[in-house]
Amino acid sequence: DGKCAGQDKPCKNSCDCCGARGECVYTGYXP
């Protein structure tokens, strides 16, 4: 739901992890 590894940022795309700019990232995320 846009939350991953303690992050709570809005995701611009449909992804489980999102970075500071709203980009999808998967570092530290185990699907």
From Swiss-Prot:
It is found in: Secreted. The presence of a 'disulfide through disulfide knot' structurally defines this protein as a knottin. Its main location: secreted. It comes from Ctenus ornatus. One of its GO terms (molecular function) is toxin activity. InterPro entries: CNTX. Blocks voltage-gated sodium channels (Nav). Disulfide bonds join C4-C18, C11-C24. Keywords: Disulfide bond, Ion channel impairing toxin, Knottin, Neurotoxin, Secreted, Toxin, Voltage-gated sodium channel impairing toxin. Pfam families: D_CNTX. This is U8-ctenitoxin-Co1a. One of its GO terms (cellular component) is extracellular region. Expressed by the venom gland. Belongs to the neurotoxin 03 (Tx2) family. 06 subfamily.
